[in-house]
């Protein structure tokens, strides 16, 4: 059962200056963790707070990944050679599983052993990336808010078009583990949420470039 918390704000006539550190992007952190997971890799993410993704970490662990806080503001993840599909992922408002992590995790589940079920409880029409993943050989069936993903051994490269921000990130994740060379159009969607994602991935060994 979801807990609803009220916030009451009482204004003042005068405000004073203050210093505040902007929190790191938790969805970007999850996306790069997905990249490590889908490639069987090992990664340390700096400037990331594991406390912000508390609902997602158990999913990675269920898939067989080792995940823990590394230092003051870093996250360590090491993926197994073959991932296990998580049973059910239900999107909910914070602090539960975020809807923006649904598409990236679905891309990972396309090559995991077993079947994963996604239930999208936040937005309608949130499975626009599925048609592109199917073109890569993924096995996904959708009905309403539910998507059932049956893992395959390997995806195949394809010419793809990013449908939206997180869907585009999902295609990048899928392309990293696909056999062959994929191209992804519509990257302006991806640029809205990630700063030079190709440079970040290239820096850790991915064969990726912007054309």
Name each model-derived stretch:
Residues 1, 5-211:
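Short, structured segments at the rim of ligand-binding sites
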């Amino acid at each position: 059962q979801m807990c609803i918390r009220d916030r009451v704000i009482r204004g003042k006539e005068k405000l004073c200056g203050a210093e505040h550190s902007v929190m790191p992007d938790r969805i970007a952190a999850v996306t790069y963790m997905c990249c490590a997971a889908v490639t069987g890799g090992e990664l340390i993410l700096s400037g990331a707070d594991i406390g912000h993704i508390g609902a997602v970490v158990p999913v990675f662990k269920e898939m067989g990944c080792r995940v823990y806080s590394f230092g003051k503001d870093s996250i360590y993840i090491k993926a197994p050679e073959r991932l296990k599909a998580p049973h059910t992922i239900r999107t909910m408002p914070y602090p539960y599983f975020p809807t923006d992590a649904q598409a990236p995790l679905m891309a990972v589940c396309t090559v995991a052993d077993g079947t994963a079920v996604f239930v999208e409880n936040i937005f309608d029409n949130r499975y626009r990336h599925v048609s592109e993943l199917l073109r890569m050989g993924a096995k996904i069936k959708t009905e309403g808010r539910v998507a059932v993903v049956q893992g395959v051994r390997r995806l195949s490269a394809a010419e793809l078009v990013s449908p939206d921000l997180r869907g585009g990130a999902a295609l990048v994740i899928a392309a990293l583990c696909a056999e062959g060379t994929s191209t992804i159009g519509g990257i302006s969607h991806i640029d809205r949420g990630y700063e030079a994602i190709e440079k970040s991935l290239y820096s850790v060994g991915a064969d990726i470039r912007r054309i």
